[in-house]
A protein has these predicted regions:
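Class I S-adenosyl-L-methionine
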Residues: 70-78, 87-205
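Core alpha/beta nucleotide-donor-binding catalytic domains of modification enzymes
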Residues: 2-116, 126-129, 134-137
Length: 205
């Protein structure tokens, strides 16, 4: 089995039915894909029409097209995940942080408060841990007041079976039963991922 077949098999959505996962700022459903592969039911929230359409096409779960904020009414769910807009904290987005109108954390915190999940997680750029660390600590403090144990860690994609150097900060809130995955020693190369495609002859004429 080559890498592409392995990934397609691993991430193939499974019919589960429960528990429910709310996927905020869902994009095309990259985070939800992993949860559906483990049998979870997902419900995405995304303001971009094309992203929502892609979500519905590739996943079993529905996607609600909406621009969410702290006043949005969310349903109860066992899990909440999301990728709050990272432009406020990324180098490419000029790192305006909490002064940026694109900040999605008020909506994410509101969803946690309403849904009361057993566990939640969000991913973001490493800039949130450094230049905007005070804001991260404020977010953590607010979520800890809701009774969650909050842990965060920088994870490098290439150490988890992905042929890409991509570092992201993963933040998890739980009730006492969670461990970050152990990094893999063996790395997947671009050649492994592309398979026979990597050996095709480039024709210029």
């Amino acid at each position: 089995m080559n890498y592409i077949e392995k990934i397609n098999n691993l991430l193939k959505p499974k019919q589960g039915g429960s528990p429910l996962v709310l996927d905020l700022f869902a994009g095309c459903g990259g985070l939800a894909l992993g949860f559906e592969a483990q049998g979870f039911e997902t419900l995405g929230f995304e303001m971009d029409n094309d992203c929502c359409a892609t979500y519905k096409k590739n996943l079993n779960g529905d996607c609600i097209q909406a621009k969410i904020d702290s006043s949005y009414q969310f349903p109860r769910a066992q899990v909440v995940i999301g990728g709050p807009p990272c432009q406020p904290f990324s180098v490419g987005g000029h790192q305006r942080g909490v002064r940026d109108a694109r900040d999605g954390f008020p909506a994410f915190i509101s969803a946690i408060e309403q849904a009361k999940p057993e566990i939640w997680m969000f991913e973001n750029v490493r800039g949130l841990m450094y230049k905007n660390k005070n804001y991260l600590e404020a977010i953590v403090a607010e979520l800890e007041e809701m009774g969650y144990i909050v842990e965060y860690k920088l994870l490098q994609a290439v150490q988890y079976g992905i042929p890409q150097n991509r570092e992201r900060m993963i933040v998890v809130g739980h009730r006492g039963k969670f461990e970050f995955p152990v990094a893999q020693k063996k790395k997947v190369t671009a050649g492994d991922a592309l398979g026979d495609i990597a050996h095709l002859i480039h024709i210029t004429e």
